[in-house]
Regions:
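Terminal and linker regions of secretory-pathway proteins
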Residues: 1-479
């Protein structure tokens, strides 16, 4: 057994040294991804070492803007989880230039965000996607502090590799648990005094304040007809959603919360996609692959007996959507399939270090789930006070982190900061249709909904999300 462990460690170390040798920008240039249509913009992918001693490296995928990349801003994208891949979700399922079409095939995404900016997708923390730590004990205790510090080191090293982007307007964006990752990283940048030209942050359906965000789930369930009046009454009087989450994070439910959990489970079928309550689900790729990609931040624990048992049940995918909107219901499964082809990994300069397969959400990282309870809305406020522009946006069909809680938090923050509404709450129009609702405070803090959008709004509502992204970069209100 000892000799086997030594051999595994030796192989990991050899992989680390091989990866680190390919350290220049040109070494990381992608000639072409298998199955991709012809494009004129450049793509890069590879590793940045964030801890030489522990041999910890983060994987990135970088796509330059379709046109005039030298004049367009740099945008860092972080997916949440905690522990889910920005390459698998952000790049290949949401707003990257390509979408997997089954097998080793890619199609163009006509609403790619690299129409407006140079986009950098980072798999973080180590243990997520292709990112790794040779010292696997790192995976046992990952938290927000470590993640933010590693992300900052990554940026410092990345700018050394891509010096042309050092003085470019810089934005940090993300969704879900990136409501922690993004403001914490932005705050580190501001505090460090590093010469990054940080202009703003954008957060989609973000976790910002545990109780407010979680309790809005219960109201959302009831207001959208997913639970009965009597169950909602039980939620508000016996065990609310934030209490249910807290007990779930700690591994067991009290009798009161057990009863509430059972009622919710009985009334909301598993075939309901909690990331988009109006969505159909992918059936053609089967449930086996979906279990591998299960998103850890789920709206309902359903763990009355054990968390392990809960994870084996069929679940809805955060990447499903209405067939009537011509959205590929099975893009998550196709992404999983595509990124596990060996020739795709070779084209991306990616390696599987200590894992058998790439997965959309980490199977090895033990993230400190109590970090979910750390409020970050105050960090957002300090960024606004520092002159950093902030956009909070919400797909309005998401029950996991509903727009209701986000809107309340932004409104309260504006009051605390003494910011008046410079754009009153109103609908915004995209292509002669209502794209959602928006409100702006002090021309620096904005809240916007994306009508019909899911938890991953750029996937489910790509056209409206691109319109919002374009306005955000320009610093202009939506029309």
């Amino acid at each position: 057994m000892k000799s086997q462990s030594w051999l595994v460690m030796a192989l990991i170390c050899m992989s680390f040294m091989q990866i680190c040798r390919a350290s220049s920008k040109e070494d990381n240039k992608i000639v072409s991804l298998p199955g991709q249509p012809q494009v004129s913009f450049q793509q890069y992918a590879g590793y940045i070492t964030v801890d030489e001693k522990q041999q910890r490296a983060l994987f990135y995928y970088f796509v330059e803007a379709e046109t005039n990349p030298a004049s367009k801003p740099l945008v860092l994208w972080l997916n949440g989880g905690p522990g889910c891949s920005s390459v698998g979700a952000g790049a290949f399922s949401e707003h990257g230039p390509f979408r997997p079409a089954g097998g080793v095939n890619l199609t163009r995404n006509e609403y790619s965000w690299n129409k407006e900016a140079n986009i950098l997708y980072l798999e973080s923390p180590a243990g997520v996607g292709f990112s790794y730590s040779a010292n696997t004990s790192f995976y046992d205790s990952v938290n927000d502090t470590i993640t933010a510090q590693d992300n900052l080191v990554f940026l410092q090293q990345w700018f050394e590799k891509f010096p042309d982007y050092k003085n470019r307007d810089f934005f940090i964006t993300g969704e879900s648990y990136a409501g922690h990752y993004v403001p914490q990283l932005a705050n580190l940048i501001v505090q460090s005094g590093l010469k990054f030209n940080l202009k703003g942050i954008a957060l989609g359906n973000p976790l910002l304040e545990f109780s407010t965000d979680m309790n809005s789930e219960g109201y959302y369930y009831w207001s959208h007809g997913l639970i009965s009046d009597s169950t909602y009454q039980l939620l508000t009087s016996t065990c609310n959603m934030s209490q249910l989450w807290r007990e779930g994070i700690r591994g067991s439910l009290s009798p009161d919360c057990e009863a509430v959990n059972d009622r919710i489970s009985a009334e909301i079928p598993y075939e309901i996609d909690e990331y988009d309550v109006t969505s159909d689900v992918c059936v053609s790729y089967g449930q086996a692959q979906l279990k591998v990609n299960d998103h850890p931040l789920r709206a309902r624990f359903r763990f009355s007996k054990s968390l392990q048992e809960n994870s084996s049940k069929p679940v809805s995918s955060p990447y499903t959507q209405k067939a009537s909107e011509n959205i590929d219901l099975c893009v998550q499964e196709k992404t999983y399939e595509y990124l596990n082809f060996k020739n795709v990994q070779e084209a991306l300069h990616a390696q599987l270090v200590g894992i058998a397969k790439w997965s959309s959400c980490s199977q090895v990282v033990n993230y400190d789930r109590e970090n979910l309870e750390i409020p970050t809305i105050g960090v957002v406020g300090s960024l606004v006070s520092s002159g950093i522009r902030v956009l909070i946006y919400s797909g309005d069909q998401d029950s996991v982190i509903p727009f209701i809680g986000s809107r309340t938090l932004v409104n309260n923050l504006a009051k605390q900061l003494g910011l008046n509404a410079t754009v009153a709450y109103r609908g915004w129009i995209e292509d002669k249709q209502v794209g959602g609702w928006t409100e702006v405070y002090g021309d620096i803090l904005s809240f916007t909904t994306i009508r019909g959008g899911s938890h991953l709004a750029p996937f489910s509502s790509p056209k409206r999300s691109l319109a919002l992204f374009k306005a955000f970069l320009a610093g202009k209100p939506l029309s």
